[in-house]
Amino acid sequence: MRTKLWTLGLCCLLLLCPSLDAKDKKKHYEPLFGKAQASYSVTSSSLKGAVFYLVSGHGGPDPGCIGHYQGKELHEDEYAYDIILRLGRELLRRGAKVYFIIQDKKDGIRETAILNNSKRETCMGKPIPLNQVARLRQRCEAINGLYRKDKSNY
């Protein structure tokens, strides 16, 4: 619960704080955001040098909590993924380096209230295992591998 509140607080802070030090006029592209949102500009260097490893949780064979709204099923993993993409986009716009550990090459940032479930999510291109411990291990190994590559930059 604290992690969710912290993530929500960080999202609010990033969205409410004005951008500073706009320096990079170049357009950047992240296809995971979807066609409409893939292009973005770095508007600040306030997070330059910071590295974030964003994991939306669940995904693949695990939809998380399932609720019902207006006769439709709502799957937690779809909303968590959408929020992580939005957070990641804001971090990138502020000059951070961002790794999206759970990925869905088709969904992207969606502008609808009801997000359809999919099981296409991967862990950085690899299928997500059904076993919960194997899923956690896979994500830890992905993050640790990325950290080892970037470690010299810290």
State the predicted function of each range.
Residues 2-154:
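Catalytic-site microenvironment of enzymes
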